[in-house]
Amino acid sequence: MTAILERRETTSLWARFCEWVTSTENRLYIGWFGCLMIPTLLTATSVFIIAFIAAPPVDIDGIREPVSGSLLYGNNIISGAVVPTSNAIGLHFYPIWEAASLDEWLYNGGPYQLIVCHFFLGICAYMGREWELSFRLGMRPWIAVAYSAPVAAATAVFIIYPIGQGSFSDGMPLGISGTFNFMIVFQAEHNILMHPFHMLGVAGVFGGSLFSAMHGSLVTSSLIRETTENQSANAGYRFGQEEETYNIVAAHGYFGRLIFQYASFNNSRSLHFFLAAWPVIGIWFTALGISTMAFNLNGFNFNQSVLDSQGRVLNTWADIINRANLGMEVMHERNAHNFPLDLA
């Protein structure tokens, strides 16, 4: 009797790690981008939570007037924030080891720069991971393309704008009231409401909300009956079923009669592409607008542009907005300037 011994191939630890990282059988896909995403987002999240709760006040304007942002220093969820890195640091790379002490690093707002840089790497890696998983599953790459819109928006307010203005202190604070302050000061200094790219972003966000509500309500109103009156309509759908769960012809007919025929999509694929593309393109434009205004290419200025036959100014809404801008401008960073307006 001949015994045949089959030699088992031994794979290296690295090969097994590579197989595990790129496996689509895992409950959560890791991927090579995930190897960057997981540590960076964990770091950003951990430091944000600690700083939001316990960070001491930060000298944001570099004039020895610290601004409190954490819960333990008197703030609540609405007023609290991680305060941006000090204007005294500017755009310098400011890790913990660059400061003379931990107290100095905290006083100069080091946590903000740490959070923003790790968060930026993390969301870029998340976008790459979306593409990577789509590639492994043989899907098209448009999920990552759609996600590039919020990535571009975050990059604009956390990275591009501080670079253009010359200091991380001009970045958006990581909190609710801080975000509102950023928006108000941005309007005062750049007149963003009069910038066409911001207008496209507003059309993208509100239009996307409208189209989402229209699509959801049309589909929900044209479901194919599979249940009795006493059952939930949701019970009429079985995950993975091949047949349509709603009547697109009925939805098309309804909307075509409500508006006009060609306002209604008769192709489900082109409809869903439109639903994705509209808000994404709008947010792309807003991010591009923030990035141009970062370098002081600002919104339209129509101030005092309408005169009567005697040469007297007839105020328009543009003039009203300009007066509001001036008021916001002179109120912000009130102790940092020797002049009523920034000279930048």
Swiss-Prot record:
It is an enzyme of class 1 (oxidoreductase). Keywords: Acetylation, Calcium, Chlorophyll, Chloroplast, Chromophore, Electron transport, Herbicide resistance, Iron, Magnesium, Manganese, Membrane, Metal-binding, Oxidoreductase, Phosphoprotein, Photosynthesis, Photosystem II, Plastid, Thylakoid, Transmembrane, Transmembrane helix, Transport. It is a multi-pass membrane protein. The modification N-acetylthreonine is found at residue 2. Pheophytin a binds at residue 126. Gene3D superfamilies: Photosystem II protein D1-like (1.20.85.10). The modification Phosphothreonine is found at residue 2. Chlorophyll a ChlzD1 binds at residue 118. Photosystem II (PSII) is a light-driven water:plastoquinone oxidoreductase that uses light energy to abstract electrons from H(2)O, generating O(2) and a proton gradient subsequently used for ATP formation. It consists of a core antenna complex that captures photons, and an electron transfer chain that converts photonic excitation into a charge separation. The D1/D2 (PsbA/PsbD) reaction center heterodimer binds P680, the primary electron donor of PSII as well as several subsequent electron acceptors. This is Photosystem II protein D1. Belongs to the reaction center PufL/M/PsbA/D family. [CaMn4O5] cluster binds at residues 170, 189, 332-333, 342, 344. GO terms for cellular component: chloroplast thylakoid membrane; photosystem II. Fe cation binds at residues 215, 272. Its main location: plastid. The chain crosses the membrane at residues 29-46, 118-133, 142-156, 197-218, 274-288. One of its GO terms (biological process) is photosynthetic electron transport in photosystem II. It is found in: Plastid, Chloroplast thylakoid membrane.
